[in-house]
Amino acid sequence: MSIETFFQQLKHPNPNVRNQGMWGIADNYDAEVINRLMALLDEEDTTYRRAAVKTLGAIGHASVTPLVAALLNSDNMTVRSSAAKALAQVVICHPDEPLSEEGVQGLKAALQDPNPVVNIASVMAMGEIGAPVVHLLIEALQTTENPALAVSLVNAIASTGDSRGIDVLQAIINDEAADSYVRETATSAISRLEMVAGFKRN
């Protein structure tokens, strides 16, 4: 099948057909195909846009540089959040290949994005990376004054299963000056983290 047919499949209501198109593109991409997918990051058709995001993830590391550029430089909030989600998909689709330093630093910088849709998407992407970036998540949690971002960071730290997060979450729980919802989230997250970290040690 042609690339054009695969792109048409990305619009299909059936997720199995979309997946076929996604992997068809990922197996036959070039720079022009990546540019075409990048142009869909603000597509109004959410099914098509999400399929483009997943396809950029399926392509993998060849899409990281343009995704980071879009994440940090686009004026369009939808493009920035889609770029963060696509970087998460790179990690999900290629678990045996660490995200490049460029990708990690791009996500770290995007934690400071003023738009919550973008900074929370970046936190979620870093949560997918897990233990290799837990120190960056901890650093962001210790310095942010944004409660919504802090809640996302707490959950991402817990999801990594890295024991380094336990003391950080305990400090928030013990800090009576901290936002009450952030403390509440840390309380529920720490038990999850202790359980997962305990399994990893055994």
From Swiss-Prot:
GO molecular function ontology, one term from the record: oxidoreductase activity
SUPFAM superfamilies xref list: ARM repeat
Entry superkingdom: Bacteria
Signal peptide: none
Induction: Present in both red- and green-light-grown cells.
Family annotation (Pfam families): HEAT_2 (PF13646)
GO cellular component term of the entry, any: phycobilisome
Keywords (A to Z) from UniProt: Antenna complex, Phycobilisome
Protein name: Uncharacterized phycocyanin operon protein Z
